[in-house]
Regions:
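Short catalytic/ligand-binding loop motif for oxyanion handling, primarily in non-cytosolic enzymes
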Residues: 41-45, 70-73
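S-adenosyl-L-methionine
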Residues: 1-37, 41-42, 49
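Functionally constrained cores in energy, signaling, and assembly domains
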Residues: 18, 31, 44, 61-64, ...
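Class I S-adenosyl-L-methionine-dependent methyltransferase module
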Residues: 50-115
Length: 115
C-alpha cells in the first residue's frame, strides 16, 4: 500500500507506524475518531486506504486536537486548497525575484513568532 506523505513535520508523528496502527482496526466500522490529530498521519493514511478500495472501512471521520491552529490548517487544506496554492505560488515568485530579501523576510517572520 502506498504511504501518504505527511502534510506537517510534527514531533511524535505516527507516519512510520500508520499502516501498523490501522492493521489493528476492525475491517469495517461506522466512525473514525482521531482525538490527537497532530500531523494527521494516521487519518490521512486511513482516508487514502478508504478511498482506494471497493469496500470502504468506515463512513465518517472526525478529528480534533488541543491546538486550534492545527485544526485551522487542516480546514484550509480541506475547504480552501486554492488559498494555499496561491499563497505559496506568491512566496515562490517573490523568492525568485529577490532571493536575499525574501530569505530575510521569512527568517524575520519565523524569528518573531516561530511558525
Amino acid at each position: 500500500m502506498s504511504k501518504v506523505p505527511a502534510l506537517l513535520k510534527w514531533i511524535g508523528n505516527k507516519q512510520r507506524f500508520a499502516e501498523t496502527i490501522i492493521s489493528y482496526m476492525p475491517e469495517q466500522f461506522n466512525n473514525y475518531y482521531e482525538p490527537f490529530l497532530g500531523s494527521g498521519a494516521v487519518m490521512a493514511q486511513l482516508l487514502y486506504q478508504n478511498s482506494t478500495t471497493s469496500t470502504p472501512r468506515f463512513t465518517h471521520s472526525y478529528a480534533s486536537d488541543i491546538l486550534p491552529f492545527l485544526i485551522d490548517i487542516f480546514n484550509i487544506v480541506k475547504y480552501e486548497p486554492q488559498q494555499i496554492k496561491n499563497y505559496y505560488s506568491k512566496e515562490i515568485e517573490d523568492y525568485y525575484k529577490d532571493p536575499n530579501n525574501k530569505y530575510n523576510e521569512i527568517r524575520d517572520r519565523f524569528n518573531s513568532n516561530h511558525n
